[in-house]
Amino acid sequence: MAFTPFPPRQPTASARLPLTLMTLDDWALATITGADSEKYMQGQVTADVSQMTEDQHLLAAHCDAKGKMWSNLRLFRDGDGFAWIERRSVREPQLTELKKYAVFSKVTIAPDDERVLLGVAGFQARAALANLFSELPSREKQVVKEGATTLLWFEHPAERFLIVIDEATANMLTDKLRGEAELNNSQQWLALNIEAGFPVIDAANSGQFIPQATNLQALGGISFKKGCYTGQEMVARAKFRGANKRALWLLKGSASRLPEAGEDLELKMGENWRRTGTVLAAVKLEDGQVVVQVVMNNDMEPDSIFRVRDDANTLRIEPLPYSLEE
């Protein structure tokens, strides 16, 4: 990507975040175009894309035949097809899997590195962007297109915007916001996604979890009414037979080192510690606190105490901004 990522700063929790413009280079864009785009995606992802309007974006999962997610995709309509945003570390293998059946359909599936992904969040983010765009997305209209630019609106953990933009316009936007906004990289957006309870699937965890183990059903990412898609049988079984015993949790506290994606944690059991869970993502905030996104059993006690393996510090469960009650 020719657009240079902004230098990193220690991320800040949403409640204290000043106006911040971020380069989202740890995320990547991909597209599907052609006459069969909608039909093809409908047979591949967990969401009902046939019901998606131009004004919506959805978090959907792309699964293998066993219902395990290759990746999750932030999906929106783009031109005559769809575009989606996923972690850069999983894009290549995810596209390889998605293309496996494409020979029989009128579709073109490709990575898109021509466009740049930017995030805007923090204090008065809407006011800052209102000076630069004629219309901004909102709860009622979550996707807005202006020329070659697409803006996506997110409510959690606090109002923020993801901008899909060409390089020249990205440079112009950066110049206009440079004076009033702090600049940061993907880690700040990652911290906000962890706080929002949006599952982060990197390469280490690709092919490991069914969508419900990462709360996708609570985020509107699974349709149980649509027709067949790859992995549907296992995803449906997890719902209707209660086969899913896992959930995504948010932990916060201290740790002398950041756990990596794919690593386990330890749960305090009386005087002992027992290994548990799988870390999806973790970030250290500027106040020294650590936030960890982890998949664990869905019946954890709310006052459970955790730690990074063999660490002296502890982590505790924080509430997510959505309910898992069905």
UniProtKB/Swiss-Prot annotation:
Gene Ontology molecular function, alphabetical = folic acid binding
Sites binding folate sit at W27, W189
Location(s) in or outside the cell = Cytoplasm
Q: Which GO terms describe its cellular component?
A: cytoplasm
Keywords, A to Z, come to: Cytoplasm, Folate-binding, tRNA processing
Q: Which GO terms describe its biological process?
A: iron-sulfur cluster assembly; RNA modification; tRNA processing
InterPro entries to which the protein is assigned, alphabetical: GCV_T_N, GcvT/YgfZ_C, tRNA-modifying_YgfZ, YgfZ/GcvT, YgfZ/GcvT_CS, YgfZ_barrel
Gene3D superfamilies tied to this protein: 2.40.30.160, 3.30.70.1630, Aminomethyltransferase beta-barrel domains
Family, per entry: Belongs to the tRNA-modifying YgfZ family.
Q: What does this protein do?
A: Folate-binding protein involved in regulating the level of ATP-DnaA and in the modification of some tRNAs. It is probably a key factor in regulatory networks that act via tRNA modification, such as initiation of chromosomal replication.
Q: Which NCBIfam families match?
A: PRK09559.1 (NF007110), ygfZ_signature (TIGR03317)
Please identify the protein, giving its name as recorded. Answer: tRNA-modifying protein YgfZ
- The encoding gene is ygfZ
